[in-house]
């Protein structure tokens, strides 16, 4: 059994160690803001697209070529008749890029040195865009729904390039097609304190006769939050 004196010495040693640890914490400098990127314009926040959910607010479409023009004509006819078109999202598959840029759900933009991250409520999609040149060269044989994105800053504008997008995705809910040669260029800038602007240029030499550009705006929603999105809980569509 330990003696009272020995127990007191043990307690005093623990107290001394605790005081020393607290002193060490006090001497540790406070960390800076978690998402600070002082070198660039702050684009961070929770945003919601405005101007409707067509790819272009004025409902214009790229000048389509050959089979892509015929495919869109067929889909447009079905759409105008209220018939469900062949859309991957009907089976809870991702909308893909650039359709993701116009879905009616909010996204959070997180900006850190060397990286910008887009957290979408829709389908719980995450886009990680390196801006420090650290991205490995994309493999053209590995196409995905949202492609490979890499970015850089031009003054107060974030420029994001995306390629290697699956060719069975569509530009918007009306079914505008594209090929595997699609290249998406986004130019994000803060128009004012509550508005984010994204000028989008699509280049696709197989499907479009010329590049197509449109501008989308997003409204800041500081009191909103990203909600859970589970498509599989309500996987129903008229065509099913």
What would you call each of these model-derived segments?
Residues 2-14:
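Bacterial N-terminal signal peptides that target proteins for export
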Residues 2, 25-240:
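PEST-like low-complexity, intrinsically disordered acidic/proline/serine-rich tracts
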Residues 13-22:
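Bacterial N-terminal signal peptides
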């Amino acid at each position: 059994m330990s003696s009272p004196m020995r127990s007191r010495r043990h307690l005093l040693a623990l107290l001394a160690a605790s005081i020393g640890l607290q002193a060490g914490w006090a001497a540790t400098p406070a960390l800076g803001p978690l998402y600070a990127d002082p070198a660039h314009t702050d684009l961070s926040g929770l945003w919601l697209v405005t101007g409707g959910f067509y790819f272009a607010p004025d409902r214009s479409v790229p000048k389509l070529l050959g089979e892509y023009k015929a495919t869109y004509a067929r889909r447009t006819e079905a759409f105008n008749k209220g018939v469900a078109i062949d859309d991957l999202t009907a089976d809870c598959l991702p909308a893909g890029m650039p359709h993701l840029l116009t879905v009616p759900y909010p996204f959070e933009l997180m900006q850190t040195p060397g990286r910008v991250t887009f957290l979408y409520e829709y389908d719980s999609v995450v886009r990680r865009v390196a801006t420090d040149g650290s991205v490995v060269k994309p493999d053209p044989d590995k196409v995905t729904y949202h492609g490979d994105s890499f970015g850089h800053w031009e003054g107060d504008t974030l420029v994001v390039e995306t390629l290697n997008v699956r060719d069975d995705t569509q530009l918007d809910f009306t079914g505008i097609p594209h090929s595997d040669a699609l290249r998406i260029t986004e130019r994000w800038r803060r128009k004012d304190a509550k508005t984010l602007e994204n000028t989008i240029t699509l280049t696709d030499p197989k499907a479009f006769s010329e590049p197509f550009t449109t501008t989308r705006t997003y409204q800041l929603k500081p009191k909103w939050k990203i909600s859970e999105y589970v498509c599989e809980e309500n996987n129903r569509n008229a065509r099913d």
